[in-house]
Amino acid sequence: VQHPPKIQVYSRHPAZBGKPBFLBCYVSGFHPXZIZIBLLKB
């Protein structure tokens, strides 16, 4: 049975209007060990 990877995306700091922030993305539960991940703005 194959399961999709687990993906978690969250900001490093609480959001503030007009201020930039960084997003952290953690992906686990996939094989092979090296994959390419693209973040797209929706």
Curated annotation (Swiss-Prot):
Cell compartment(s), UniProt: Secreted
Q: Which GO terms describe its cellular component?
A: extracellular region; MHC class I protein complex
One Pfam family of this protein, by short name?
Answer: C1-set
Q: Which domain of life is it from?
A: Eukaryota
Q: Where is the Ig-like C1-type domain?
A: 5-42
Coiled-coil residue windows: none
A Gene Ontology biological process noted in the UniProt record is: antigen processing and presentation of peptide antigen via MHC class I
Q: Which InterPro entries match?
A: Ig-like_dom_sf, Ig-like_fold, Ig_C1-set
Q: Which keywords are on file for this protein?
A: Immunity, Immunoglobulin domain, MHC I, Secreted
For this protein, the record's Gene3D superfamilies field holds: Immunoglobulins
* Subunit-level organization: Heterodimer of an alpha chain and a beta chain. Beta-2-microglobulin is the beta-chain of major histocompatibility complex class I molecules.
The record's function comment reads:
Component of the class I major histocompatibility complex (MHC). Involved in the presentation of peptide antigens to the immune system.
Q: What is this protein called?
A: Beta-2-microglobulin
